[in-house]
Amino acid sequence: MNGDAGRIATGEPVTATTPSTRRSLPPLVEPGPELGREEVARYSRHLIIPNVGVTGQRRLKNARVLCIGAGGLGSPALLYLAAAGVGTIGIVEFDDVETSNLQRQVIHGRSDVGRPKADSARDSILAINDGVTVRLHETRLESSNAVQLFEQYDLILDGTDNFATRYLVNDAAVLAGKPYVWGSIFRFEGQVSVFWEDAPDGRGLNYRDLYPEAPPPGMVPSCAEGGVLGVLPGTIGTVMATEAIKLVTGIGEPLLGRLLIYDALAMSFRTVTLRRDPGRVPVTELVDYEAFCGIVPDAAASARSAVTPSELRRMLDEGRDLALIDVREPVEWEIVRIDGARLVPKDRILSGEVLADLPQNTPIVLYCKTGIRSAEALEVLVRAGFSDATHLHGGVIAWAQQVDPSLPVY
């Protein structure tokens, strides 16, 4: 080895030659109280870093950081922020721990299944650092509470996995005048950036500069639909925690105005420069974000458009003539399926390529994992004239829970 790589390997100090120190932002938080004897011992590896030191650690101690979600991204971010000595950590989370979470949400354990995620996350944080004040907000983040909640904190971390909440977080952060760290994961790839409309150096950007409009519903699958490599949120969540620490202490160059893209399969990181959209409409109020993102398909809004698992069971038991269509992906079909179903992935319905092959005069029942993708496919069928089409409310998960408990749930 030679160069910087060799010097790092042998422990020789390496001086950074990047312009990062010239682009640092002022520290977000003023120093808190003096450190106690135990705190000096705990954070000693921070204290001997010149750029952090005692003052930086006191800033962390005085910081109030709010994490939206205690799931895949929130788990590592919360654990490392607690270990780093962030004084007050808020958690917005209203879900319970499920078995499928354990593959990636490392803040929760097997014994936590069925518990509120907020409670589980709090216990894990305090087990690492009982000097942290943990505030739980066990509620859904909504337009009615977001700004008021954000105003109580110095910095926000967005660990959510849907576009409606991401736009809500962004707009609320803009109105509250708060910076926030955003992360996103899917299968083998992740992204991280920092958004701060009121950044003091004039580089202010927000999420709408990256995504002016939400993609059409269903175009970008969630982790529940498309899957995610279990270790991926560990990488991205840790980067998010790093950005939070940099903002609080004022060290380094934050990802403000840059998008970090990580490819786990290629083991590569790259950054893309972001610029303010000159045509972006200023954020002046919070709106209905589910409507903004088009989350609820018109065809699925009517109660007549869905059947319950028990209703479908009765239809099948009575031998009714119907076409049961599974709109999930082939890999999901291999995990679990409803007997008698035919696999027709949603994208083939949305593209219209299979419409001619579907029966016009036979009732059609669509299903997916939870009912979201089947509702999207149903909207296309209704527009195409399939008047006797419906979908399974709750999808194959509800079927397994209510009709056939022997089936696996994923």
Regions found by a protein language model. Name each.
Residues 60, 149-154, 358-359:
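A short, aliphatic-rich alpha-helical micro-motif
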Residues 2-3, 11-27, 130-143, 147-148, ...:
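E1/E1-like adenylate-forming module used to activate ubiquitin-like modifiers
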Residues 67-70, 91, 366:
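Hydrophobic Val/Ile/Leu positions in short beta-strands of Rossmann-like dinucleotide-binding domains
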Residues 2-66, 99-100, 288-300:
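N-terminal charged helix/coil linker that caps or initiates catalytic domains
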Residues 3-11, 16-19, 25-27, 123, ...:
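Rhodanese-like catalytic fold shared by cysteine-dependent sulfurtransferases
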Residues 73-74, 373:
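Hydrophobic/small residue at the entry helix of a nucleotide-binding pocket
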